[in-house]
């Protein structure tokens, strides 16, 4: 019995690695982490989206590739090996899985299709459910969210926020709302964005 990646998974992984080797050298990564390579980062993001990464886990019926977590793991390995400054886990793994399993049919049609078409991008704020921090907390009441979240993942370039309260109830917030304040958190990893 064979326990490795399939030919399709290897092919997808190799395409991602090849793209990153060509467009995301360590010199490019260094410029991006020093705040000088905004256009370079946009080119990397655009190129990876053109490879179909945004629709990897979105079901085919909503315009995605309908692949599985093993494909996502293979892509994640390539992104990690190349120190890619690319928001992947939150917007293109966690969000499609949460929306596929926890949203209404109307929400699936709207949000999953928009992810596959690269019209929206989700940041993830699940720390309240996973490991609440002092001074943080969110509540849902009357279709409104109130509170403060720490360590929101992948907020840079995001249009929406997928967040959870301490009980695991998940909500969606449009980041264009004027009542939202985003504070960038400084961490050791300069290739990822975290916020409050």
Q: Can you name each region flagged by the protein language model?
A:
Residues 113-196:
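FAD-binding core of flavoproteins
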Residues 39-53:
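Active-site-flanking structural segment that lines cofactor/substrate pockets
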Residues 14:
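Conserved "HGTGT" condensation-loop signature of ketosynthase/thiolase-family condensing enzymes
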Residues 49-109, 117, 154-158:
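Internal helix-loop-helix
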Residues 28-36:
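C-terminal helix-coil-helix/basic helical segment that borders enzyme active sites and/or dimer interfaces
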Residues 1-8:
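Intrinsic disorder at enzyme termini
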């Amino acid at each position: 019995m064979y326990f490795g990646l399939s030919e399709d998974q290897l092919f997808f992984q190799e395409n991602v690695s090849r793209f990153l080797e060509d467009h995301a050298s360590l010199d490019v990564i260094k410029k991006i982490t020093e705040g000088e390579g905004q256009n370079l980062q946009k080119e990397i993001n655009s190129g990876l989206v053109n490879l179909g990464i945004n629709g990897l886990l979105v079901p085919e019926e909503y315009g995605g590739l309908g692949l599985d977590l093993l494909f996502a793991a293979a892509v994640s390995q390539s992104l990690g090996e190349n120190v890619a400054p690319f928001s992947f886990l939150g917007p293109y793994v966690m969000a499609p899985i949460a929306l596929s399993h926890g949203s209404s049919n109307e929400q699936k049609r709207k949000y999953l299709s928009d992810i596959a078409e690269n019209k929206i991008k989700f940041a993830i704020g699940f720390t309240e459910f996973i490991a609440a921090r002092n001074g943080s907390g969110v509540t849902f009441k009357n279709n409104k969210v109130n509170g403060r979240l720490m360590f929101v993942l992948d907020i840079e370039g995001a249009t929406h926020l997928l967040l959870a309260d301490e009980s695991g109830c998940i909500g969606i917030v449009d980041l264009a709302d004027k009542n939202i304040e985003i504070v960038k958190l400084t961490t050791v990893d300069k290739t990822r964005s975290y916020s409050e």
